[in-house]
UniProtKB/Swiss-Prot annotation:
Bilayer-crossing regions: 8-28
HAMAP family in alphabetical order: PSI_PsaI
Signal peptide, first to last residue: none
GO CC terms: chloroplast thylakoid membrane; photosystem I
Name listed for the protein in its UniProt record: Photosystem I reaction center subunit VIII
Gene that this polypeptide is encoded by: psaI
Superkingdom classification of source: Eukaryota
GO process annotations (BP): photosynthesis
């Protein structure tokens, strides 16, 4: 039963967290590169 709606929870989390995390890491990398 849990496996039935697990993808419905997992997909939005991956779809929202992964792009946000990659954007945050890129922003931090750009800031560090700009400062130095």
């Amino acid at each position: 039963m849990a496996a039935s709606f697990l993808p419905a929870i997992l997909v939005p989390i991956v779809g929202l967290v992964f792009p946000a995390l990659s954007m945050a890491l890129f922003f931090i990398y750009a800031s560090i590169d700009d400062i130095s």
